Amino acid sequence: MFSTSDQVSKMNSRILSALLILGIATCVIAGGFCPKSRHPQCNLSYKINDCCAQSDCRVGSVCCVEGCGNVCRAESDTPLGEKFVDGSECKHGHVFPKKWYQFWWRV
C-alpha cells in the first residue's frame, strides 16, 4: 500500500512536469517580435539580405525587414519592427534593383 507522502510526492512530480512542459511549449510557440529598426532608410542602391526565412536565424533571433535588407535580430517583447514573412520573395546576399531593360527582357 502507498503511504500519503508517496501520493503527495507523485502528485507534486506530475504538477511540476506539467508546468515544465507548459513553460517550454510557451517559449517555442511564442515567436518573438522584431525590435525597432536601427536604419529605417537605406542610402545604398542595393539591399543585403542575411536571411530569407525565420529558420535562417539562430534560436532567440528573428528575421527582420530593415531599410538595407533582411537581418537576424534578437527577439523583442514588443512589436516595434517588421518581421519577415516566410514564403515571401527573397534572395540571399546582395540584391540589386532591376535595370530598365530587364523589365522587357528576362535577363
From Swiss-Prot:
InterPro entries: Elafin-like_sf. Expressed by the venom gland. Residues 1-30 form the signal peptide. It is found in: Secreted. One of its GO terms (cellular component) is extracellular region. The keyword Disulfide bond applies. Keywords: Antibiotic, Antimicrobial, Disulfide bond, Secreted, Signal, Toxin. One of its GO terms (molecular function) is toxin activity. Disulfide bonds join 34-64, 42-68, 51-63, 52-90, 57-72. It comes from the Eukaryota. Contains 5 disulfide bonds. The keyword Signal applies. GO terms for biological process: defense response to bacterium. Residues 31-76 form the WAP domain. Belongs to the venom protein 11 family. 02 (wap-2) subfamily. Has antibacterial activity. This is U20-lycotoxin-Ls1b. It comes from Lycosa singoriensis (Wolf spider).
